Amino acid sequence: MSANDTISDMLTRIRNACAVRQTTTQIPTTRMTRSIAQVLKDEGFIADFEEVGEGIKSQLVLSLKYKGKNRQPIITTLTRVSKPGLRVYSNSKDLPRVLGGIGIAIVSTSKGIMTDREARKQNVGGEVLCYIW
């Protein structure tokens, strides 16, 4: 399946996998999805990820995290902010705080993909891709 918006496709696949309590989900690999997966791993939203396959057919396999006996997903909400039809940009001073700092905003900056906190520390703004909490 070919997706025009790979970020929305990635977020939807993660959201659907969490809804049915799957342990892993597969996502087509791009530089952007690999960078977002690294941010999710660094922030503790996913356990791990690995790239399987080669070339254009390569996939990222994300290992999702759950808590408790009922296996409640660590990721409760994934929201796409900047979309292909309406881009959302923010400077470093106006970057949003998601749920007062409990969640994260993933930002695409000139220094790479990072969280809103890292972007504030480095004093860079950019395109606000999504909110996660």
Curated annotation (Swiss-Prot):
Keywords: Ribonucleoprotein, Ribosomal protein, RNA-binding, rRNA-binding. InterPro entries: Ribosomal_uS8 (IPR000630), Ribosomal_uS8_CS (IPR047863), Ribosomal_uS8_sf (IPR035987). SUPFAM superfamilies: Ribosomal protein S8 (SSF56047). One of its GO terms (biological process) is translation. The keyword Ribonucleoprotein applies. GO terms for molecular function: rRNA binding; structural constituent of ribosome. GO terms for cellular component: ribonucleoprotein complex; ribosome. It comes from the Bacteria. Pfam families: Ribosomal_S8 (PF00410). One of the primary rRNA binding proteins, it binds directly to 16S rRNA central domain where it helps coordinate assembly of the platform of the 30S subunit. NCBIfam families: PRK00136.1. This is Small ribosomal subunit protein uS8. It comes from Microcystis aeruginosa (strain NIES-843 / IAM M-2473).
